[in-house]
Amino acid sequence: GSYWESVCGYSRAVKKGERILVSGTTAIHGEDRVICRDDPRGQAVYILDKILAAVSALGGQRSDIVRTRVYLANQDHFESVSRVHGRYFEGLNPANTTIEVSNLIGDHLVEIEAEAIVDEG
């Protein structure tokens, strides 16, 4: 897990039954290195790769993701981040909510959560 996961007492992702819940994920590496500091598109790519790795580590795959929530620090980033999301989930089309928030901690421009359901049958 990341530095902040241990400090704050949470998991990147948890699996309960068939559900995988991925915590709000930002483009941070280590304790404080923001990846693609001024690039919302680059942050979205980094975040979605991190989310897919977390889902995979718990036995899921991209096609198991049924919901995403995208938080943007600036609504002007909606199109560029949405296009990245669209490339990652083309043809899968999970439920999605995208909202602008008043602020994200640090220099983050994007934060994304995800939920997956793994058919264990």
Regions found by a protein language model. Give the residues of each.
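Short, polar/acidic, helix-capping and beta-turn segments at strand->helix junctions
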Residues: 1-121
